[in-house]
């Protein structure tokens, strides 16, 4: 979790360096939806993590993603977008619906989609000619590989209930870190606009 928090802190630092704000305002609703997504993930718990200790795994979030000097504003938003997109894809899988309460799952997918729409607007403002290359940059590619490892883990574990519980906890940690930082981002943006 520390490495995910470090990555997201790097995203905020880059966004609020000497150049100022991101150039896009995340709505207050964006943060509220993020909190709701976390509550939904908490409610989706079906097993005690104690029963799944043998299935624990370090998903090896890449440390090189926390190098602030490597990030530009568009890359930072792109990485955050990739995290939400991959989370959406993960829970949108056909096999995911067997593991969760379908009402909670649908609400989570709707919330993730709303957050992605907000970030799509930011990406549109921040990207120009570099748009096509963003998905191939180191940080975004590393995020894709991180989630690919999660997909492989689920396959290897036969999409078992314990495997899904471990993944739910991992995604909950990641989204928790991103939600906290998005709240700070909104507060900092408000401070920058104050007289």
From Swiss-Prot:
| Keyword Acetylation included in the entry's annotation | no
Is Secreted set as a keyword in this record?
yes
**Organism per entry:** Bos taurus (Bovine)
Q: PANTHER family given for it?
A: INTERFERON OMEGA-1 (PTHR11691:SF37), TYPE I INTERFERON (PTHR11691)
Q: Which PROSITE patterns match?
A: INTERFERON_A_B_D
Where does it primarily localize? secreted
Q: Which GO terms describe its biological process?
A: adaptive immune response; B cell activation involved in immune response; defense response to virus; humoral immune response; natural killer cell activation involved in immune response; positive regulation of biosynthetic process; response to exogenous dsRNA; T cell activation involved in immune response
Q: Where is the signal peptide?
A: 1-23
Q: Which gene encodes it?
A: IFNW1
**Do you know which Gene3D superfamilies this protein is assigned to?**
1.20.1250.10
Q: What does the similarity note say?
A: Belongs to the alpha/beta interferon family.
GO terms of molecular function: cytokine activity; type I interferon receptor binding
Q: Which cysteine-cysteine pairs are annotated as disulfide bonds in the entry?
A: 24-122, 52-162
In Swiss-Prot or TrEMBL terms, this protein is called: Interferon omega-1
Q: Which UniProt keywords apply?
A: Antiviral defense, Cytokine, Disulfide bond, Secreted, Signal
Q: Where in the cell is it found?
A: Secreted
């Amino acid at each position: 979790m520390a490495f995910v928090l470090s990555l997201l802190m790097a995203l905020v630092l880059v966004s609020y360096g000497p150049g100022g704000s991101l150039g896009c305002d995340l709505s207050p609703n964006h943060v509220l939806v993020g909190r709701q997504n976390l509550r939904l993930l908490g409610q989706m718990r079906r097993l005690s993590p104690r029963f799944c200790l043998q299935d624990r795994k370090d998903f090896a979030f890449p440390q090189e993603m926390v190098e602030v000097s490597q990030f530009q504003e568009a890359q930072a938003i792109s990485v955050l977008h990739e995290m939400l997109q991959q989370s959406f894809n993960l829970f949108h899988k056909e096999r995911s619906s067997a593991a969760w309460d379908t009402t909670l799952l649908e609400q989570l997918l709707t919330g993730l989609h709303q957050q992605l729409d907000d970030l799509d607007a930011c990406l549109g403002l921040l990207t120009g000619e570099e748009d096509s290359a963003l998905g191939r940059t180191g940080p975004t590619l590393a995020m894709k590989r991180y989630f690919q490892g999660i997909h492989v883990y689920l396959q290897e574990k036969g999409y078992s209930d314990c495997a899904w519980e471990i993944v739910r906890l991992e995604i909950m940690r990641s989204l928790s870190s991103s939600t906290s930082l998005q709240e700070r981002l909104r507060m900092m943006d408000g401070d920058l606009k104050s007289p």
